[in-house]
Amino acid sequence: MDKISVIVPVWNAHDYLERCVDSILGQTYTNLEILLVDDGSSDDSLAICQKYAEKDERVRVFHKENGGQASARNYALDHATGDFVGFVDNDDWIMPTMYERLHQLMTDYQADVGRCDDMQGKMEDSVSAEKADILVTEADEFFGLLYQDIWGGHVTDRLFRRSIIGDARFPHSKTIEDMRFMRVILPRIKREVSTNEKLFFYTIRENNTSMVYARTYINAYERAVEFQSRYQEALEKYPQYCNLLLKKASSFSCSAMKALIHEKKQKTQEYIALREFMRKYKKSILMLEDLQLRYKLFVFAAV
């Protein structure tokens, strides 16, 4: 029976951690190892983790100095022994059948990745699909959908074969580490199978890593840099993706530059780098048919 490693970065999660870990221990797929990585918590999160390790031998607890979510995930990947890997954030929780369902789908369809739908809210609010829709996406289509960010690049609603992760690790980022990690492993994925069943639940809270920087400068800046990089790569390798990538690079660059202007930081390296990209591709940006007029006006005036 295949082993699934479930990786949970833990940081000051007193109010949510037990719900999270209980949902993993309650999985109908029982051959699990649960790696709880305490990332320098200042509350009693580590003690809660150790309590679970004493009760269930499948729980492995690690403690490290605070380094952020990517660092904690990478630490766990270095110690994981499973054939499959899943990721759950410490304030999220999952349906009892999530990993059994995804593992079965991946086995049936010989897929490298399995994905389910997610939702915000309570588990009892979930509505099961009357008939589960199964979608199998082959390598070329899957690559295009994620590379252009048409599909979300989250890792928490997915199950991965360990073999496709290999030595890949999460890059340090405040907002888009999942997106950057998925970009690294994209060329290795030959097939993904997904279901519309809602098996994963997430929480939005003020200090949630994935939400706290939403619609802020940091989010816009990191996405701008990422899409600029993808666009420049696509010019040589994937010309069919160029228009959408340039649209995203431009819109996020404009948002980040506006935020820097508001803070009177036009002389920073970040602003200068964003402006240089916009200048270099100004003609192509202004020719984009579906780029919002407000962005074109900003490019025309400020670049």
Residue ranges and their predicted role:
Residues N12-G26:
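Short, well-formed alpha-helical segments that are part of the catalytic scaffolds
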Residues V85:
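Short aromatic/hydrophobic "clamp" motif used to bind/position activated sugar donors
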Residues S23, T30, D38-A47, G68:
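A conserved acidic beta->alpha catalytic loop
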Residues K64-A80:
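Glycine-rich, basic loop-to-helix element that forms the pyrophosphate-binding segment
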